[in-house]
């Protein structure tokens, strides 16, 4: 009997449920860019929490320093380039009403975003 890590089992289930090549090339590229941006998005998420906490605790100097770090992440040319490409791909994948044209694209992208969210913790 083969024993898999729970996350591997979930990934295998998604692979089994989704035929190979079922998502569009735009969705594949979107997912690849999400993977590249995952560390930056995780850092931004943590900084947002730290900024909110610093503001609530009235640690103005800390909040200002954290906002500067956040702004520095946004100024990175590679990050900016990738995020602009994501916006273009999102427009192509979207049906104009907030949903994906292809439900399998939405499912694959959503899965990637959930996995990234939980890896960030």
Can you say where each PLM-predicted feature lies in the sequence?
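Immediate post-signal-peptide N-terminus of mature secreted/exported proteins
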Residues: 21-64, 118-120
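Extracellular/secretory pathway and lumenal proteins
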Residues: 11-12, 46
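N-terminal signal peptide c-region/cleavage motif recognized by signal peptidases
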Residues: 17-19
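Bacterial N-terminal signal peptides that target proteins for export
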Residues: 1-9
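Disulfide-bonded cysteine motifs in exported proteins
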Residues: 3, 37, 114-115
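Compact alpha-helical subdomains of small soluble proteins
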Residues: 67-121
